[in-house]
């Protein structure tokens, strides 16, 4: 930050450029500072556009091992119903050192197979379960695997999506990204299943209202205080298949009572 505040005259500003002008600094110095700030911003923007997997990333498939970390990470996935097929399909790996040490890495790729996000989940019981990259979440999770001609399923996290399997899109949070909303309309998606917890469903009510008005069949799937990963593939889909399309009266009830 370039904010400044003079405690004598109480003047303040948001950039060194305004401060230097105020004190009548040499023009050469002012020009140098003025050029520095845009370059700095541009550099940060360019850096933020490219995301890479952690350099310490180890693939379960291409870099198998017999270390304690490998066994712990693999067991963690297995206990959550993630088998070798999903591990290979989604390119899941883990880190034993670095910023994401002792964490499972679940990548997300866009339609062109370019990394657009990844989730880092502790497999050793850390107080901080997730430690994600400092980039925007305005992406379409698992986009590479989405078939827009079929109903899509919106869920909160990657483990939920791995449990649901079929056309599941993790939101990496409780709100629906703008990029995803736009894509839903451009692809003319006809049916959407929303598999989120109570808090997340409240955040999505306005969107559901808009989707319903635009003729998109919407389903609020209620898992009774469970998450997809707890229930597993078969039970989740039993609930999804038994869920009726959300009607206007259902929508009003959700709005009034949650």
What are these regions, as identified by a protein language model?
Residues 6, 77, 194, 228:
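A residue-level signal for conserved active-site and pocket-lining positions in enzyme catalytic cores
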Residues 96-191:
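Phosphate-handling DNA/RNA-contact segment within nucleic-acid enzymes
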Residues 218-227:
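A generic structural motif
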Residues 1-22, 95-100, 110:
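N-terminal single-stranded DNA-binding subdomain of primase/primase-helicase replication proteins
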Residues 23-105, 109-112, 146-147, 182, ...:
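TOPRIM metal-binding catalytic domain and adjacent DNA-binding surface shared by DnaG-type primases
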Residues 103-104, 185-189, 229-243:
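Short, surface-exposed amphipathic charged segments that create phosphate/polyanion-binding patches used
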Residues 154, 190-203:
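Acidic beta-strand-to-loop metal/phosphate-binding motif
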Residues 203-215:
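Short, aromatic/basic amphipathic alpha-helical patches
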């Amino acid at each position: 930050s370039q904010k400044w505040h003079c405690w004598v005259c109480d003047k303040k500003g948001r950039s060194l450029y305004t401060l230097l002008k105020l004190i009548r600094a040499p023009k050469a110095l002012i020009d140098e500072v003025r050029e520095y700030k845009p370059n700095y911003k541009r550099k940060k923007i360019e850096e933020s556009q490219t995301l890479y997997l952690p350099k310490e990333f180890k693939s379960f498939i291409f870099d198998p091992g017999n270390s304690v970390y490998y066994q712990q990470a693999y067991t963690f996935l297995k206990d959550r119903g993630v088998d070798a097929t999903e591990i290979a399909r989604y390119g899941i790996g883990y880190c034993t050192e670095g910023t994401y040490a002792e964490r499972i890495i679940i990548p997300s790729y866009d339609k062109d197979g370019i990394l657009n996000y990844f989730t880092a989940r502790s497999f050793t019981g850390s107080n901080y379960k997730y430690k994600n990259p400092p980039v925007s979440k305005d992406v379409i999770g698992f986009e590479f695997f989405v078939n827009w001609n079929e109903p899509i399923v919106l869920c909160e996290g990657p483990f939920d999506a791995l449990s649901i399997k079929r056309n599941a899109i993790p939101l990496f949070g409780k709100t629906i990204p703008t990029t995803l909303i736009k894509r839903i309309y451009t692809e003319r998606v006809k049916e959407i299943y929303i598999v989120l917890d109570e808090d997340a469903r409240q955040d999505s009510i306005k969107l559901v209202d808009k989707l319903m008005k635009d003729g998109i069949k919407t389903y609020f799937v209620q898992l009774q205080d469970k998450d997809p990963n707890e229930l597993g593939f078969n039970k989740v889909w039993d609930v999804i298949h038994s869920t009726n399309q959300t009607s206007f009266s259902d929508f009003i009830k959700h709005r009034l009572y949650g």
